[in-house]
């Protein structure tokens, strides 16, 4: 079987370091990019122990309001916190919901200040929705801009060229 010396030289350059044989150091294996969830939880619990975080009982659910009008809802929540270091960890299954879905459940739990903030957020959210409809380029937006009508050609422009 004939061996092409040019191909052999190219393969030797590609191989770089020797991967085996007597007296050669072994290469370390590549680590997998995907991480295990249990490893992350172990690191988190170790960090919380450093902060001397204690489990906070009596919290049945947590709602985090986002700027885009959605809510991150934790129905079954586990809360740990350290008041001294101002650190709190919220864990558990989460769901992303719209504000309108949660308002009947949230209103009895809120205070006066929170209700005012919620009203402001609702007004701001409705303004954002109106702006999105105008910029979406729907049929109503085109009629308002006057771009819907195309003018008819009255003359033949080729006659004017001659």
Swiss-Prot record:
KW Repressor (keyword) present: yes
InterPro entries attached to this UniProt entry: BTF3, NAC_A/B_dom_sf, Nas_poly-pep-assoc_cplx_dom
Parts of the chain that traverse the membrane: none
Pfam families, sorted: NAC (PF01849)
Domain of life: Eukaryota
Subcellular location: Cytoplasm; Nucleus
Key words, A-Z: Cytoplasm, Nucleus, Protein transport, Repressor, Transcription, Transcription regulation, Transport
Ranges of Basic residues composition bias in the record: 24-33
Domain NAC-A/B: 38-103
GO biological-process terms attached to the record: protein transport
Keyword Nucleus in annotation: yes
Function: Component of the nascent polypeptide-associated complex (NAC), a dynamic component of the ribosomal exit tunnel, protecting the emerging polypeptides from interaction with other cytoplasmic proteins to ensure appropriate nascent protein targeting. The NAC complex also promotes mitochondrial protein import by enhancing productive ribosome interactions with the outer mitochondrial membrane and blocks the inappropriate interaction of ribosomes translating non-secretory nascent polypeptides with translocation sites in the membrane of the endoplasmic reticulum.
UniProt record similarity statement: Belongs to the NAC-beta family.
Subunit comment: Part of the nascent polypeptide-associated complex (NAC), consisting of EGD2 and EGD1. NAC associates with ribosomes via EGD1.
Protein name (record): Nascent polypeptide-associated complex subunit beta
Name of the coding gene: EGD1
